[in-house]
Regions:
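Short small-residue beta-strand/loop micro-motif enriched in glycine and branched aliphatics
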Residues: 7-10, 147, 215-218
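A conserved beta-strand/loop capping segment in the N-terminal third of enzymes
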Residues: 1-29
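Predominantly flavin-linked oxidoreductase catalytic cores and closely associated redox partners
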Residues: 32-177
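FAD/FMN-dependent oxidoreductases across multiple families
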Residues: 49, 132, 153-237, 242-243
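Acidic active-site catalytic centers that drive phospho-/nucleotidyl reactions
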Residues: 27, 72-75, 211
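C-terminal helical "tail/cap" subdomain of flavin- and related membrane-associated enzymes
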Residues: 239-326
């Protein structure tokens, strides 16, 4: 839906895509898979500091650990990422580059989801809820609704988030997309980097992966695909470092080149497309409403269904084409 609710894009994905799963189930499955191949899982363990002295010493609430390599993958506020930034002279993210996502997964019952969202589990996206430079969403699952909204901090900080959250739930209730008798929950959220990947993701003995490195789609907020793909690339880099005994920044920079070659341009292009979509959402939804091809591109990229294929999609040139045509 466009901000005015005047224009609406309807698009039906091929059977079988996308799949929705609760984040808790997904995270636990990944954790178990790591344990199955030999990773030692340490819960309730906080990292307090890192020391580099020919290797790396990780100081935690359960003692110190020594290694040749450490990987930062704890999100945009990752302490290790801050150290890489300082070492490589990269400025911290500003409010113009950061966003906040608020999310809630209430159980509403399979009958409600079936009746309202159908067998195909229709997904909802509303642009600019409450004037925020971002979007609200509802992703139905079996008996659960994933509800949330996200946007740039530059606009979120200037409004009352609680009021916008409540207004968005009221809108969903009014339109029948949420049970009218269900209470509105307290608001809670998490930070998101929305300016594309940082310019350096390595230093001696160190790699950054996922949100810590800014590997997030500025359009959809999708980061799992990029983080997991970067993780695979990191494994190959670390294997070579172990074989040669060279854990220097120069050696590890191959990791940065490799992931950048795979999806770096995609994330940079998405940054530009997101700027167009979030700055001019009424216009962009209108173009999608008029142009079936842009509608398909928009739905695909926005919902993160086929990340890694942006180059074939050409969303920017299609949007510019529609701007001239309409």
């Amino acid at each position: 839906y466009s901000p005015s609710m005047k224009y609406k894009i309807d698009f039906e994905f091929p059977v079988g895509t996308p799949w929705n799963i609760t984040r808790e189930v997904f995270d636990n499955a990944v954790l178990e898979a790591a344990g199955d191949v030999g990773a030692e899982i340490m819960t309730e363990t906080r990292v307090s500091d890192f020391e580099f002295n020919g290797g790396v010493t990780v100081k935690t609430s359960k003692g110190e650990f020594h290694s040749n390599m450490v990987i930062g993958a704890t999100g945009p506020n990752d302490k290790l990422a801050g150290m890489v930034r300082e070492k490589r002279k990269i400025k911290p993210w500003s409010d113009n580059q950061m966003g906040t996502a608020l999310m809630w997964e209430p159980v509403v019952g399979k009958e409600f989801v079936d009746n309202v969202y159908g067998d195909n589990r229709s997904l909802l996206v509303h642009f600019k809820p409450g004037g925020i430079e971002g979007y609200g969403w509802v992703f139905p699952k079996q008996d659960i609704l994933n509800i949330g909204f996200g946007g740039y901090n530059r606009t979120i900080k200037s409004v009352k988030v609680k009021e916008i959250w409540e207004d968005y739930i009221k809108l969903l209730k009014k339109d029948g997309y949420f049970p009218k008798d269900q209470d509105i929950p307290p608001v809670k959220g998490a930070p998101l980097p929305l300016d594309g990947p940082i310019k350096a993701t390595t230093m001696d003995n160190t790699l950054l992966v996922g949100d810590s490195a800014g590997m997030v789609s500025p359009l959809s907020g999708e980061g799992i695909y990029y983080g997991m793909h970067a993780g695979k690339i990191a494994i190959n880099t670390i294997k070579k470092a172990l074989e040669t005994g060279d854990f220097s920044q120069k050696q590890l920079d191959q990791y940065h080149r490799d992931w950048n070659k795979v999806f770096g341009k995609e994330l940079r292009d998405l940054s530009f497309f997101a700027l167009m979509a979030l700055k001019l959402p009424e216009r962009m939804v209108y173009y999608g409403y008029r142009d079936e091809k842009l509608c398909e591109i928009f739905a695909d990229l926005f919902l993160g269904v086929t990340p890694g294929g942006l180059g074939k999609r050409k969303p920017i040139s299609r949007a510019l084409y529609d701007a001239i045509r309409y």
